[in-house]
Amino acid sequence: MYDRKEGRIFMADKMFENNQVSIVGEIVSDFRFSHEVYGEGFYMVDVAVNRLSNYMDYIPLMISERLIDVNEDMVGQNIYVTGQFRSFNRHEEKKNRLVLSVFVRELEFLDEIDDEVKSNQIFLDGYECKEPIYRKTPLGREIADLLIAVNRSYGKSDYIPCICWGRNARFASGFDVGGHVQIWGRIQSRE
């Protein structure tokens, strides 16, 4: 459950405590078929989420046809979702591409988006799986690139790239491969 006013995520299912996402935004694309598992179809749809800077992040959602009518035009609808941030490797010609999306577990349609609500939150509890890369941007901002492995059921893991800024970047640059980390933040669009 999510307390939107307070911006806190509460999930009763213990299995999902190590990977929690809540997003509030506007649907900006049609549903695209992704795959089917045991007769259940899964579809991709994009949601625009506003940052405090008024820049929009476009976040892909993976959603079951059992949660929403994928044949209906939902573009322009405001939606609140909770779920997990998932990854998989898509094999493209001669290389693999890491595909990231929010796997939707629950959703709610909203009449309007309250600007006071924290509209984009993620919590990950996992393990650093490669050496952090610390660097400075051309504008002098400190950042550290991390790759976090987050375990899920059936022996699977999601590999989530993360960026830390400022003093958090300096702190994260000292993380050891295999070390346990907990991260709170937001999901940003990939360029």
What are these model-derived regions, one by one?
Residues 2-191:
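OB-fold and OB-like single-stranded nucleic-acid-recognition modules
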